[in-house]
């Protein structure tokens, strides 16, 4: 991989910021649930009070990005409409309605009389988030961090610097008004600082990158800090021979055009050969009328597609109104294609045959496998998590959309009355190992 990024050592200014966030995170980790909820409400209040300033900053960012020729996908993510801002503010409040993820008892055992073991959830500490464009992500991530008792260091794309700065200022004012330390939320604005974050293992406990495949892989390979995230969103939808044709058309269209710049939008449509003629006869004009460029394999082109796909197309996350189509002989071939090219984000099947659906869902190794529904449902808010800090495609947990439950870890608490191991070794005491 070309070394387009460098990992500098953090300078004194960055170290000072990191130390402030670390100390603030310790305070917040000890803050009662009701006070963390109170902080979220104040954060939302200050976002509302500063909404005019935030939208003006976003208009300036958007205008500048347009002049620089930034891609349509990034421009779409950058734009913060009044409706999107209001939804983000409401999302901050709704995070407060979620169950407290901190101090939850997962295990409680009596090891011996008077010797009690508990496993309880605790905050991770300081989160380091690196993301592109989407300024609404600042609200989501910050609210989840505070709700789960964590501090957060944020680095958004430079194209959104004015918007992100305005949002973070409002969030910090809300924190301060609530009585919590405003330093729990910190925004970095330079590329150098975002890369130097990778050397802050003494301050940051988890890095969550949300950006290009190249950036995510670079971060995973160049830090000693644990990394949670996904590099690509190459999602597939398979139209089985026993699919309901109208359902297949509706779900395929929604999975692509509802928000093509999203990582849960499909990039490849796999179609069973025996339903392909009837499906494509309706799908081609439907997608064309929605400005979707269709490219496909030889069999798809023979059935009416204008553009032939290359090998690279099956590996590409378009994040745009472009869709690759491949005709397959059976569900096994569809699964083989997905296992080869999927980014393990979300893959779906449309079929009325429950056995085929179960086979597909059990074998495809993605964080989300869907039956007869749009891949666009792969989202923390739509799952009822309130919001998400990111999506993980790794096999170990957390996996899929990561909400509050993915921002806590656990700790073992053992309370006794002078118990010593030697008494158990000598037979003076016995283990009971009783669940409480």
Curated annotation (Swiss-Prot):
SUPFAM superfamilies: ALDH-like. It comes from the Bacteria. Its EC number is 1.2.1.41. Keywords: Amino-acid biosynthesis, Cytoplasm, NADP, Oxidoreductase, Proline biosynthesis. It catalyses: L-glutamate 5-semialdehyde + phosphate + NADP(+) = L-glutamyl 5-phosphate + NADPH + H(+). Pfam families: Aldedh. This is Gamma-glutamyl phosphate reductase. It comes from Prochlorococcus marinus (strain MIT 9215). The gene is proA.
């Amino acid at each position: 991989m070309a070394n387009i990024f460098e990992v500098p050592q953090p300078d004194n200014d960055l170290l000072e910021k990191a130390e402030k966030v670390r100390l603030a995170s310790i305070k917040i980790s000890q803050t009662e649930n009701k006070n963390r909820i109170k902080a979220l409400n104040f954060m939302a209040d200050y976002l509302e009070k500063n909404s005019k300033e935030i939208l003006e900053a976003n208009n300036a960012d958007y205008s500048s990005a347009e002049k620089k020729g930034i891609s349509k996908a990034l421009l779409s993510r950058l734009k913060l409409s009044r409706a999107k801002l209001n939804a983000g503010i409401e999302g901050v409040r709704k995070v407060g309605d979620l169950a407290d993820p901190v101090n939850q008892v997962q295990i409680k055992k009596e090891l011996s009389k008077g010797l009690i073991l508990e496993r309880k959830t605790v905050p991770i500490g300081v989160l380091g988030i690196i993301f592109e464009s989407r300024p609404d992500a600042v609200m989501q991530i910050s609210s989840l961090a505070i709700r789960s008792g964590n501090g957060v260091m944020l680095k958004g794309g430079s194209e959104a610097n004015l918007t992100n700065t305005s949002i973070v200022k409002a969030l910090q004012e809300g924190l301060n008004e609530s009585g919590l330390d405003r330093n729990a939320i910190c925004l970095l604005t330079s590329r150098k600082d975002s890369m130097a974050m990778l050397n802050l293992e003494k301050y940051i406990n988890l890095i969550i990158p949300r950006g290009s495949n190249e950036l995510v892989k670079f971060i995973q390979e160049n830090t000693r800090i644990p990394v949670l995230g996904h590099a690509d969103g190459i999602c597939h939808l398979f139209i089985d021979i026993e699919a309901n044709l109208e359902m297949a058309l509706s779900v395929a269209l929604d999975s692509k055009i509802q928000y093509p710049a999203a990582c849960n939008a499909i990039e490849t449509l796999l179609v069973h050969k025996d339903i392909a003629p009837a499906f494509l006869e309706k799908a081609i004009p439907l997608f064309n009328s929605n400005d979707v460029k269709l490219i496909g394999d030889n069999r798809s082109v023979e059935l009416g597609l204008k553009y032939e796909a290359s090998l690279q197309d099956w590996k590409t996350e378009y994040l745009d109104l472009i869709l690759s189509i491949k005709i397959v002989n059976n569900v096994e071939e569809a699964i083989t294609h997905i296992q080869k090219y999927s980014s393990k984000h979300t893959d779906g099947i449309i079929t009325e045959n429950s056995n085929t659906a179960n086979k597909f869902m059990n074998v495809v190794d993605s964080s989300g496998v869907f039956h007869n529904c749009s891949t666009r449902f792969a989202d923390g808010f739509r799952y009822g998590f309130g919001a998400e800090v990111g999506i993980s495609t790794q096999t170990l947990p957390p996996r899929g959309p990561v909400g509050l439950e993915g921002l806590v870890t656990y700790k073992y608490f053992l309370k006794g009355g002078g118990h010593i191991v030697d008494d158990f070794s000598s037979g003076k005491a016995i283990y009971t190992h009783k669940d409480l």
